[in-house]
Swiss-Prot record:
GO terms for molecular function: amino acid binding; ornithine carbamoyltransferase activity. It is found in: Cytoplasm. L-ornithine binds at N172, D235, S239, M240. This is Ornithine carbamoyltransferase. The keyword Chloroplast does not apply. Carbamoyl phosphate binds at S63, T64, R65, T66, Q90, R114, H141, P142, C143, Q144, C275, L276, R303. It comes from Parasynechococcus marenigrum (strain WH8102). Its EC number is 2.1.3.3. Pathway: Amino-acid biosynthesis; L-arginine biosynthesis; L-arginine from L-ornithine and carbamoyl phosphate: step 1/3. The lineage of its organism: Bacteria, Bacillati, Cyanobacteriota, Cyanophyceae, Synechococcales. The keyword Metal-binding does not apply.
Length: 318
């Protein structure tokens, strides 16, 4: 076990002091090592004490799992969390981001930012002098993907060559699944209606990152997308900020519900994933949500372990 821990620490040492704004910010080796460390922390084979360091959360979007999992992860690492809601700080009164980022860097050892625009996150990283983590933007959700592939690995073993089918909008979650999956050697299929594809630039980037023969595909037939897949993943059809499009999207996504009939086309041992919150009866049927194939709540738990590993790596606590 000591040898394994040393190997993981060596692979993760280049991450110390770096930002994590995108799944593509880590190499294939570094991404795999984050999952290895997360598994060690989850099993209790590894314990890390960061010595009372401080995480600052800057969340302008609502959050349950991301907020709580970061807070608990930091506590388990022996650190503390400061919740910096813009509504109750000077950010809400127009203080420039560049001033806030530099001041918070004097108080905190790492910042996690959850906001709408990716550029705002990039600006925080530019001005901060401590690591900045993407806790979700409209472009990506990289911490979620770490938990997703940790869950898939727990269910089916080594990831290279496995297939994950994502059924739904080509959104931030889909983007990070493509990028992270490409690095890990996982075939990722995005099953979506016409007009709801991932951004072409992200698709091209994922394909350029693909290792060990992984394929990244966009397929407009949901049944074809899930055919033979080891994991079937879905998300809400209207993300935060798209509530006005709910009715239009319900029509566009008709036939894209992950239900019992669709799951028949997947691998017989396929697992079901959802980043939550879920709208039962829309993107996923109640039966599939509660089925034996569902690993949705394991997946939610794994946010904690994946982020604990990421925090330790970025703060050089290995």
């Amino acid at each position: 076990m000591a040898t394994a821990a040393a190997g993981v620490a060596a692979a993760l040492s280049p991450l110390s002091g770096r930002d994590y704004l995108s799944s593509a910010d880590c190499s294939a080796e570094e991404t795999s090592a984050v999952l290895d460390l997360a598994a060690q922390l989850k099993s209790g084979d590894r314990r890390i004490d960061l010595g009372n360091r401080v995480l600052g959360l800057i969340f302008t979007k609502a959050s349950t799992r991301t907020r709580v999992s970061f807070q608990v992860a930091m506590a388990r690492l022996g650190g503390q969390t400061v919740d910096l809601n813009p509504k109750v700080t000077q950010l809400g009164r127009g203080e420039p981001l560049e001033d806030t980022a530099r001041v918070l860097s004097r108080y905190c050892d790492v910042l996690a930012v959850r906001t709408f625009a990716q550029q705002e996150l990039v600006d925080y990283a530019h001005w901060a002098t401590v690591p900045v983590i993407n806790a979700l933007t409209d472009l990506e959700h990289p911490c979620q993907s770490l938990a997703d592939f940790l869950t898939m690995r727990e269910a089916h073993g080594d990831l290279p060559g496995q297939t994950l089918a994502y059924i739904g909008d080509g959104n931030n979650v889909a983007h990070s699944l493509m990028l992270c999956g490409a690095l890990l050697g996982v075939n990722v299929r995005i099953g979506c209606p016409q007009g709801f594809e991932p951004l072409p630039g992200v698709l091209e980037q994922a394909r350029s990152l693909a290792v060990q023969g992984a394929s990244i595909e966009v397929i407009h037939d949901p049944r074809e997308a899930v055919r033979g897949a080891q994991a079937v993943y879905t998300d809400v059809w209207a993300s935060m900020g798209q509530e006005d499009e709910q009715s239009e999207r319900e029509q566009a996504f008709a036939g894209f519900c992950v239900d019992e009939a669709l799951m028949e086309a997947a691998d017989t041992e396929a697992i079901v994933l959802h980043c939550l919150p879920a709208h039962r009866g829309e993107e996923i049927s109640p039966g599939v949500m509660e089925s034996s194939a569902s690993r949705i709540f394991d997946q939610a738990e794994n946010r904690l372990h994946a982020q604990q590993a990421l925090l330790a790596a970025l703060m050089g606590g290995l």
